[in-house]
């Protein structure tokens, strides 16, 4: 491969999953040198790869599952030594709540940091999270200044936190002025019962789905003439109508959409439910089976489309102080286990 033109070599490397790429860099000095010396290789590589799927019980659990993109086998699982909640994901960072400890971690760079939340009203005890309190906690990386990105535990869209109300209107709370305003907008006329409100590339997105079609809406003109604009229609042709028990749209990141289907399986002695994950690749315009959810998993699950990122973030990669620990530090085995699950080579 050393004799290939650089642009062809890059195209080959861009098609390799991140674990294999890490192994290549460990075993081939020439390729390691090429990757490290090529400007913007990392940013281009991670912009192309598909997100993997990370999920955990909604009310917290020591067991976490991870589906690697392009791998339809059973998910990788890990059992942490303490009860774990995943409160959010953004730009390759995970916001974790481990045994009353708030932690931000980057599995790719193997950096993490425990945060002091003693003054926060959101985390006085583990019980508050089980009560659904995590639903009002957002997590974002503020990249206004590209040279000094930093993470914040809020969900930011143009400097505000957004809530979608039952009537379709949106409440925006400005973090700087500490004032709220109501955005008078209504749901699209075609809105269905299966919906998902999310953010893609810092833009608000609404998913509305039927058993036949999935509609993707983008929020336009937030300050002047707010409205939902239909940007994509996806044919929903993956459901097993004869055995269908339930289904939900679980995640969307602009590159792929994840649908969870529960089917009723019968054998000679009894009946049982099987949960299957389907993924729609927007670039290839096709459905594929991501895999199945283990039978021991609860029905209430939180899903995160995880894409690793090598970017540095203020507060996480700062080497001053003892809050930043190496990945192999034995004092925090639960964080290590989660990072090995996502990025470990096995």
UniProtKB/Swiss-Prot annotation:
Parts forming coiled coils: none
Annotated F-box domain residues: 1-49
Domain of life: Eukaryota
Name recorded for this polypeptide: Putative F-box protein At1g57580
Source organism of the structure: Arabidopsis thaliana (Mouse-ear cress)
Lineage: Eukaryota, Viridiplantae, Streptophyta, Embryophyta, Tracheophyta
């Amino acid at each position: 491969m050393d004799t290939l033109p650089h642009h062809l070599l890059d195209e080959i490397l861009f098609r390799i999953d991140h674990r294999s790429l890490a192994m290549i860099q460990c075993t081939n000095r020439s390729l390691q040198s090429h990757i490290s010396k090529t400007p913007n290789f990392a940013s281009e590589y991670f912009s192309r790869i598909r997100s993997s799927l990370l999920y955990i019980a909604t009310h917290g659990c020591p067991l976490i599952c991870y589906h690697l993109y392009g791998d339809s086998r059973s998910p990788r699982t890990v059992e942490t030594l303490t009860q774990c909640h995943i409160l959010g994901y953004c730009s390759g960072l995970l916001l974790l709540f481990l045994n009353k400890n708030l932690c931000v971690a980057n599995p790719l760079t193997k950096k993490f940091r425990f945060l002091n939340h003693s003054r926060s009203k959101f985390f006085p005890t583990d019980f508050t999270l089980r009560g659904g309190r995590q639903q009002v906690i957002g997590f974002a990386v503020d990249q206004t200044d590209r040279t000094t990105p930093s993470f914040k535990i809020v969900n930011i869209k143009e400097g505000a936190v957004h809530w979608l109300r039952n009537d379709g209107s949106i409440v925006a709370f400005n973090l700087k002025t500490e004032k709220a305003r109501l955005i008078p907008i209504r749901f699209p006329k075609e809105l269905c019962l299966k919906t998902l409100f999310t953010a893609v590339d810092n833009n608000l997105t609404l998913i509305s789905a039927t058993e036949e079609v999935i509609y993707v809406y983008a929020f336009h003109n937030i300050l002047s003439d707010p409205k939902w604009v239909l940007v994509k229609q996806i044919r929903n042709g993956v459901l097993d109508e004869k055995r269908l028990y339930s289904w939900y749209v679980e995640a969307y990141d602009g590159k792929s959409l994840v649908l969870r289907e529960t089917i009723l399986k019968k054998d000679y002695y009894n009946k049982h439910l099987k949960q299957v994950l389907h993924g729609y690749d927007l670039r290839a315009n096709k459905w594929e089976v991501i895999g199945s959810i283990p039978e021991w998993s609860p029905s209430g699950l939180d899903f995160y489309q995880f894409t690793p990122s090598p970017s540095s973030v203020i507060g996480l990669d700062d080497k001053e102080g003892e809050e930043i620990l190496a990945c192999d530090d034995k004092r925090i085995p639960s964080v290590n286990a989660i990072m090995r699950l996502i990025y470990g080579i096995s």
